[in-house]
Amino acid sequence: MKRLITFSVFILTFCGMNIQAQSECLPQKYSIIFGGGLSLPYVEGNRNDFFNKNGNRVGYDLMTEGRYYFLPNFAVGVQYDYLRMACLPDKAHLHYIRPNIIFRHLWSNGNQGTFFSLGIGYMDYQERTYTRDQRRGHLFQKGYCGISFGMGYEFHIKYNLSGMLRFDMLTADWFANPDARLFNPDPDGYDDGIDHSWFKNNITFFNLGFALQFGR
């Protein structure tokens, strides 16, 4: 996996450095993005899983994304995220790949912008936990249909290079809430402390980081 990540970063860097556009604004045709940052998990699991044993431990996120712009304010793309959390010898990691729809607002002659993205794809979660005097540990792996939301701020640096501050939320394991209701039947607005939303999920990751974008 480390070799795959290294190879992917190399390919993206090579492709990015060979984009010969000299435009003095953010990409409006196509772009290649790679970056990373912190990953803040919120995972509810069973009594033996990584997060219940070690808490919602902070990890890191590595990401790559390709975008094709139909309009300066609208694009489609493909994004891949790799997340890793560890409390040695226990460790957990996640692979998530999905197509994205991106909406963007530009200003300052196209040199700055904000974006919002929505994606649905495949999420593969794996963890290995150990108990005392156990060498092999307990391996758990499961695939999910993941839903992601992203937003961020883009700024032009020079030529075909721009920077990006971004926030992504990755979610999975959604289910219908058995306690769901449309409205509070209590006329006084009493809050019973129970979540009555229609849908709930058990897996959420909040990723905050920085990325470099090459494109034209």
Positions of predicted regions on the chain:
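Gram-negative (and chloroplast) outer-membrane scaffold detector with strong preference
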Residues: K29, L40, E65-I147, F155-L161, ...
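Extracytoplasmic loops and strand-loop junctions of Gram-negative outer membrane beta-barrel proteins
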Residues: N46-D49, R132-G137, G189-D195
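Positively charged n-region of N-terminal signal peptides that target proteins for export
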Residues: M1-L4, Q22
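Sec-dependent N-terminal signal peptides
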Residues: L4-C15
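Predominantly the C-terminal beta-signal and adjacent terminal strand-loop region
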Residues: G152-R216
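Outer-membrane beta-barrel biogenesis signature
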Residues: I19-G35, G215-R216
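Outer-membrane beta-barrel and related beta-rich outer-membrane complex signature
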Residues: N46, D90, R128-Y130, F175-R181
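Surface-exposed strand-loop-strand hairpins of Gram-negative outer-membrane beta-barrel proteins
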Residues: G37-M63
